[in-house]
Amino acid sequence: MTRTKLTAVTALVALALASGGPPARAQERVKIRVAALTLPVFNPIIVHLMKEKGIDARHQLDMDVRAYPSIAAFYAAVATGEADTTVVGGPTVFQKMRTEGVPIRIVATIVPQSDLVILTASPAIQSLVDLKGKTLAADMGSQQYQAVAIYGRAKGLTLGTDVTVVQASFALARTQLAAGRVDAAMVIEPIATMMLKENAQYRMIFNGGVAWRELTGEEGWDLVVPLREDFIKRAPAAVARWIAALQEVQAFVKQNVDEADAIVARTVKLPPGIFKEALASGRWVVDVRPAWGARERKSIWDMFERAVAAKYLEKLPDDAIIYAP
């Protein structure tokens, strides 16, 4: 080795030692398999916003997005392990899955119950109790229906007995009300905003957040964030990254609502302006908080207990359903 080369090598070694060794490799991105619905609902909106803005990559995550055409297939993907997360889902849906042996845990909140509404065009119907003797289009298998039924019972109203309930998905409930086949429809955002825009006679007679707060003191959660236990064990540090990524989506939506609306219109095919209007209404709220916080855990667990007390579900899940670091 020449003196010049030796001097150069010596200098590089000295520099490396002074800087604590060779440069560390960039932190590897963790692959997370994400179930995404092909419907214009909250789940694909979050997925598309995160991907479009590169938010997953900024948090050392790599979303492997897998599309599903129905809610049943969507939940089945995380139940079977085909996906690590559905991004969002109903607390009592995960309660049922956990009690049936699915290794699912709730790591964060994301959407309060304010996105659940009942709409009517009838001037005679002013509140939920006014539906006595009337017809309601609703998805009776949904968590949202459970929430309405629990509140109704507290008001002395039994759905299915005092109110004739017509089984309908949220999209079909919209159609049934428009055709005049029912007196009211139970829907969620963004369908609610689209309905209110298309018919000036529609009025909101029930809001899930307002009703649940009246009943429990908390707004409750329509959607929470799940992760499979095997994913958590495989990449424990990814839990905090996933929550942080979702919080960045929340911040982006709040600070760049017009850009977010344009992305949603292009990718999820919502009419332009609907996403923005739903957010502005205060009904559609993105609120990502770690599920293990005392207030959040208590609110989620209260929903579990009420589902069992109302006999919608047979039993409570084990404590581990709510993740804690």
What positions do the PLM features span?
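Sec/Tat signal peptide C-region and signal peptidase I cleavage site
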Residues: G21-A26
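Short, solvent-exposed loop/beta-turn-alpha elements that line the ligand-binding surface or hinge
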Residues: R58, G209-E218, V285-R295
